[in-house]
């Protein structure tokens, strides 16, 4: 084993982490300038090996931390890596890392990263060969110097330390201490024995007086016993009488208490009922307010609907009257229309005839006037034109103008014909449009009627659904009220059960529920109280039998219970007892065949899989009719028995009983919890079903209302469309009338155009006929005759035309009046009256009135229902009020009964207190006389009956006389005999103890002798080994020299003349009163091999250092270590000895495989080193690097020249 590597961080001058290269397993040398950190490097290794820096205080730890520039180092560590290939450390690893970390508040060791204690480190190092008795595997600066200055006695102490004689000395000192304590005890024992002997002589003289005293004392005790016994018997008789009276009063008090308790329970029950009734009454009052509000609302709605229906009826009656009036007016207007049409039809032909006559006359007049004009023009052509050609030219021009006029009139004629044709087409289209709209109106009116019918149907369905919803609301309210009531009772029962459950058990059960939920643990069935049920009359028996076992939790197997217990412990969540079904077995019990004793287990209801758990708790218990039966069964059948009242008789003989408060029954609370939980679940399911039905009804109502709104919107739209279509028909009729007017006007214009065309054509034909004729200045006879006839004829025609015109205007005026009356009055009035009649016929008033009447019927039904409901609520209020009054009366009676019972109870309590006080007095008296009898001590057999027949007064007189006689012996030591016996026993015991101490003293003396012998043997053995190795090592270090170690004895001191002046040889060693055999170790050496040997004080400094080194190497050879640390051991050596030391180290490393780590300022150790490390220092921070041998020698040479 050897040190493989050293890692330092934050330790003294080593700030940053420094990890050395692996050390050689032979010779390693460390060089560096003074103050560079070589010694700190050695201190770091010793810091881990714990030979220094063992018990560090805070300031010591702070001194080990690096102090320099930059941030402060708060912790440091040194880690040594050991090569353990030879397994010197008892660890199955080839490499071991031992680290020591130090901080301001810590000092820890780590082995391969795991924390270990300081003691474990020391044991580990000792197991590897590091002896606490031999610390010379580390030689620090100054150790050599101290060895050179050692006195002979100090060298002897060194040998003792190396040889381990300290153990012998410690054991010897402990033995001497024990001997001293034993001597002290022996002295004390001798003094006590001497005192006891004197007291025994005195007590022997007092025994005779004591005998006489004892005879009188025997008589006194006998008298006192008889008096005490009689008094005790009297007290017991009185106590029995008091107990009988107290039992009777207690029974009566119990009855009164039961009556008070029953009255209180009944009162509480009445309070609960009163509370519920008050709550129900408040609910009824609220319901009454709601129903009254509904009734008021229904009455308002009914009144409004009645007014609406009356309004509709009035409007319908008015519409019927209006329709009749309109029909009458329509008939009148239609008759007038027919008359006007007939008159118009009669006038039209006459008018047209007159117009035709007028037109024909006008046409004839125009023709004649034209002829007359032509004749006049022809007659004046000769004067107008100079020749025929000019005339023809003019005629041609006239003909062309007429032709243009003709063309223009022809175009106008064609245009008028086209317009008339278009107007006729428009008229036909308007007729078709009107027919189409009338068909659409019929369809829309049919659709409106169907929508009204469907709307009324949907309304009835909606009203029915609303009625159903109202019923469901009532059910929902009722269920919610019942659930709230059940939950209140459930919470009360849970709270009462919690109060009846021990606190740690309650917390445990709550913790189990959370643990099972959080960690998803299955197989937990719950406490027994939740798994068992029975008839209510067995509740007391079951609870008293089980006790807190009712809260034992049944689980499927013990793995589950183990897991839960682990969680309970970690959470500190209370305590619970588990019953794993895979572990428990129900006991096999033979029950008695007795009708008065029934197995309790048979009266329980539970799941068969829980039978082992319940059998373990209740299997050995039977329910008995009374305590007599229970006592008999428990004794004969070895079973636990219990009565229905909860009185127990154990099979082991014990009896337990008394009052049991049934109001705190755990099973009753659990029964309420289970039943209410079941009822709540059922009610909540019903409530959920009702709410689901309400949701469906709400959806249906919403759907029906939506459908009603759609139908209402549809018929409203249809009405708007009908009105629009009727308006379009009216507009079309107006347009038809306008078109008729336009056609008449266009036809008249067309007739005028055609007349003008004929006139133009006639004029053109006349002018064309005149062309080419001769130009004459006079007319022909025929023309003159014609001219003479034309004027009269024209005049006559004009007169006729005037007559025709006058007649035509008259007829035209009448015709216009008729047409205007028909068009603007009669037709409009007919249309209006028809529209009025149609609106009355098509009016939705009857339908709306029917709807309103239906709504009125519904409103009347709602009013009746509200009245019935209000009456029902009022009846319920009256009933609840009567019940409340009845409960209050019952409460008053119960209060009176309770007060009477409490008064009786107070009297009984007072009587019981008096009896109890008397009982305590008698008990105290009984205890007093019992204690007095016991205080008399053991009595002779005749003492019980000697004075039995005497009365108390005689006994007291006799006792008085006996007491007077005893006063004569008042000076007698009453404990003389006891003291004599006691002192005799104490003397024998002390004498035995003295003998034991004497024997122990001899054994301790033998042990001290053995220890002294073994100590001397150890010193001699160690000295021989060290002396032998010293001679060898000295001869190796000093050529031709020799040296010896001489151990000095007491006899040598007296005969040694050579050392008379030696200051270290004249002290006599004394250890704990014993003169030591050895008093010192001398060193005698010769460096030349010739002449006499020299003592240490006769040597030079270098020679002393050689001797000290030889002694160190000798000690090391006696107790070899795996490696050695030398810190500048060659500092004071002469060069030839430094070479010898280096060669010795080299030889030890090669021959024995020992590792050396040395520091030096000299070249000799560097030359023999296998690996050399340089320590450098910069900015108060040290680092360690491997350097070559030449670099090390150069550094040493420069350092020595610098020192020079």
UniProtKB/Swiss-Prot annotation:
PANTHER family named among the record's database cross-references: STRUCTURAL MAINTENANCE OF CHROMOSOMES PROTEIN 3
Superkingdom as given in the UniProt entry: Eukaryota
Pfam families xref list: SMC_hinge, SMC_N
Family: Belongs to the SMC family. SMC3 subfamily.
The protein's name in its UniProt record: Structural maintenance of chromosomes protein 3
Regions annotated as coiled coil: 190-420, 474-502, 673-744, 803-1009
Main location: nucleus
Entry keyword DNA repair: yes
UniProt motif (Nuclear localization signal 2) ranges: 457-464
Loss of function: phenotype: Altered chromosome dynamics and cell division during seed development, leading to aberrant mitoses and giant polyploid nuclei in endosperm as well as arrested embryos with a few small cells.
Domain Zinc-hook, residue spans: 2-1180
Motif (Nuclear localization signal 4): 799-806
GO BP terms, alphabetized: cell division; chromosome segregation; DNA repair; meiotic cell cycle; sister chromatid cohesion
Family annotation (Gene3D superfamilies): 1.20.1060.20, 3.30.70.1620, P-loop containing nucleotide triphosphate hydrolases (3.40.50.300)
Purpose: Central component of cohesin, a complex required for chromosome cohesion during the cell cycle. The cohesin complex may form a large proteinaceous ring within which sister chromatids can be trapped. At anaphase, the complex is cleaved and dissociates from chromatin, allowing sister chromatids to segregate. Cohesion is coupled to DNA replication and is involved in DNA repair. The cohesin complex also plays an important role in spindle pole assembly during mitosis and in chromosomes movement. Essential protein plant viability. Required for chromosome segregation (e.g.
């Amino acid at each position: 084993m050897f040190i493989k590597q050293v890692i330092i961080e934050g330790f003294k001058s080593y700030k940053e982490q420094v990890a050395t290269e692996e050390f050689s397993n032979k010779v390693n040398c460390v060089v560096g300038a003074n103050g560079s950190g070589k010694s700190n490097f050695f201190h770091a290794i010793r810091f881990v090996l714990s030979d220094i820096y063992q018990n560090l205080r805070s300031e010591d730890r702070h001194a080990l931390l690096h102090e320099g520039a930059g941030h402060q180092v708060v912790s440091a560590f040194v880690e040594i890596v050991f090569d353990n290939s030879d397994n010197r450390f008892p660890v199955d690893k080839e490499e071991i890392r031992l680290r020591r970390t130090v901080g301001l508040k810590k000092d820890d060791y780590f082995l391969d990263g795991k924390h270990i204690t300081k003691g474990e480190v020391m044991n580990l190092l000792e197991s590897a060969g590091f002896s606490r008795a031999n610390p010379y595997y580390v030689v620090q600066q100054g150790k050599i110097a101290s060895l050179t200055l050692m006195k002979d006695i100090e060298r002897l102490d060194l040998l003792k330390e190396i040889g381990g004689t300290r153990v012998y000395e410690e054991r010897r000192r402990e033995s001497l201490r024990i001997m001293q304590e034993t001597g002290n005890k022996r002295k004390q024992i001798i003094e006590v024995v001497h005192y006891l002997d004197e007291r025994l002589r005195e007590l022997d003289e007092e025994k005779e007086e004591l005998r006489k005293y004892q005879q009188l004392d025997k008589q006194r005790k006998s008298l006192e016993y008889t008096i005490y016994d009689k008094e005790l018997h009297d007290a017991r008789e009185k106590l029995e009488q008091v107990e009988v009276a107290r039992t009777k009063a207690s029974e009566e008090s119990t009855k009164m208490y039961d009556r008070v308790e029953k009255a209180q329970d009944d009162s509480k029950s009445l309070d609960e009922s009163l509370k519920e009734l008050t709550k129900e009454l408040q609910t009824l009052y609220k319901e009454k307010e709601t129903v009254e509000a509904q009734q008021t609302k229904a009455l308002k709605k009914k009144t409004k609907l009645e007014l609406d229906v009356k309004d509709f009826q009035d409007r319908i009656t008015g519409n019927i009257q209006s329709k009749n009036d309109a029909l009458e007016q329509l008939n009148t207007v239609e008759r007038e229309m027919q008359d006007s049409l007939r008159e118009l039809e009669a006038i039209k032909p006459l008018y047209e005839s007159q117009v035709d006559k007028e037109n024909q006359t006008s046409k004839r007049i125009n023709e004649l006037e034209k002829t007359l004009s032509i004749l006049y023009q022809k007659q004046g052509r000769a004067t107008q034109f100079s020749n025929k050609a000019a005339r023809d030219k003019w005629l041609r021009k006239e003909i062309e103008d007429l032709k243009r006029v003709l063309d223009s009139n022809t175009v106008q004629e064609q245009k008028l014909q086209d317009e008339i044709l278009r107007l006729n087409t428009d008229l036909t289209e308007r007729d078709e449009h009107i027919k189409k709209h009338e068909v659409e109106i019929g369809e829309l009116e049919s659709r409106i009627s169907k929508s009204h019918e469907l709307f009324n149907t949907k309304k009835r369905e909606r009203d029915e659904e609303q009625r159903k919803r109202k019923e469901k609301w009532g059910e929902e309210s009722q269920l919610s009220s019942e659930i709230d009531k059940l939950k209140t009772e459930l919470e009360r029962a849970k709270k009462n059960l919690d109060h009846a459950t021990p606190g740690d058990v309650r917390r445990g059960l709550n913790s189990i529920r959370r643990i099972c939920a959080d960690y998803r643990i299955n197989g937990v069935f719950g406490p027994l109280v939740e798994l068992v049920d029975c008839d209510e009359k067995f509740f007391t028996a079951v609870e008293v039998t089980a006790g807190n076992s009712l809260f034992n939790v049944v689980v499927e197997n013990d793995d589950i219970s183990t897991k839960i217990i682990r969680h309970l412990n970690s959470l500190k969540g209370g305590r619970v007892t588990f019953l794993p079904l895979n572990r428990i077995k129900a006991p096999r019990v033979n029950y008695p065949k007795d009708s008065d004793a029934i197995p309790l287990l048979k009266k329980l209801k539970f799941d068969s899989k829980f039978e082992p758990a319940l059998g373990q708790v209740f299997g050995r218990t039977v329910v008995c009719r009374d305590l007599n039966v229970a006592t008999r069964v428990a004794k004969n059948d070895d079973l636990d028995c219990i009565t229905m009242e909860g009185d127990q008789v154990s099979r082991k003989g014990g009896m337990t009983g008394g009052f049991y408060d049934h109001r705190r029954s755990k099973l009753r609370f659990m029964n309420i919890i289970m039943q209410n939980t079941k009822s709540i679940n059922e009610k909540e399911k019903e409530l959920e079903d009702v709410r689901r039905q309400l949701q469906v009804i709400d959806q249906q109502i919403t759907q029906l209302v939506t459908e009603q709104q759609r139908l209402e919107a549809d018929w409203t739209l249809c009405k708007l469309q009908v009105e629009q279509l009727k308006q379009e028909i009216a507009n079309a009729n107006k347009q038809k009338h306008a078109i008729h007017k336009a056609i008449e006007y266009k036809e008249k214009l067309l007739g005028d155009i055609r007349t003008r065309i004929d006139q133009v054509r006639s004029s053109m034909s006349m002018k064309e006929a005149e062309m080419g004729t001769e130009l004459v200045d006079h007319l022909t006879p025929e023309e003159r005759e014609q001219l003479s006839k034309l004027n009269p004829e024209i005049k006559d025609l004009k007169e006729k035309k005037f007559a025709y015109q006058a007649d035509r205007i008259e007829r035209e005026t009448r015709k216009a009046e008729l047409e205007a009356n028909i068009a603007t009055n009669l037709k409009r009035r007919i249309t209006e009256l028809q529209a009025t009649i149609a609106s009355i016929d098509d009016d939705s008033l009857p339908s709306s009135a029917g709807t309103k009447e239906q709504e009125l019927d519904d409103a009347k039904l709602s009013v009746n229902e509200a009245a019935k409901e209000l009456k029902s609520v009022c009846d319920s209020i009256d009933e609840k009020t009567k019940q409340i009054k009845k409960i209050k009366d019952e409460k008053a009676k119960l209060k009176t009964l309770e007060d009477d019972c409490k008064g009786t109870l107070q009297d009984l309590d007072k009587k019981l207190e008096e009896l109890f006080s008397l009982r305590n007095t008698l008990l105290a008296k009984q205890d007093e006389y019992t204690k007095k009898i016991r205080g008399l001590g053991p009595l002779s057999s005749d003492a019980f009956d000697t004075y039995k027949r005497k009365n108390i007064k005689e006994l007291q007189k006799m006792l008085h006389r006996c007491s007077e006689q005893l006063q004569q012996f008042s000076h007698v030591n009453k404990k003389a005999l006891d003291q004599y016996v006691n002192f005799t026993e104490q003397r024998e015991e002390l004498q035995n103890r003295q003998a034991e101490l004497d024997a122990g003293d001899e054994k301790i003396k033998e042990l001290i002798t053995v220890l002294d012998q073994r100590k001397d043997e150890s010193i001699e053995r160690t000295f021989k080994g060290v002396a032998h190795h010293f001679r060898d090592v000295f001869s190796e270090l000093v050529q031709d020299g020799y040296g010896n170690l001489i151990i000095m004895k007491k006899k040598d001191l007296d005969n040694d003349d050579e050392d008379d002046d030696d200051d270290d040889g004249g002290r006599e060693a004394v250890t704990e009163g014993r003169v030591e055999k050895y008093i010192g170790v001398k060193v005698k050496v010769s460096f030349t091999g010739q002449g006499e040997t020299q003592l240490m004080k006769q040597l030079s400094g270098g020679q002393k250092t050689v001797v000290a080194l030889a002694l160190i190497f000798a000690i090391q050879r006696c107790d070899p270590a795996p490696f050695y640390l030398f810190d500048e051991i060659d500092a004071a050596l002469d060069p030839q000895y430094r070479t010898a030391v280096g060669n010795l180290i080299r030889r030890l490393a090669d021959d024995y495989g020992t590792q050396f780590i040395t520091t030096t300022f000299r070249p000799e150790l560097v030359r023999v080193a296998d690996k050399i490390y340089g320590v450098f220092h910069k900015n108060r921070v040290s680092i360690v690097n491997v350097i070559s041998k030449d670099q090390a020698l150069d550094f040493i040479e420069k350092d020595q020249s610098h020192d020079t």
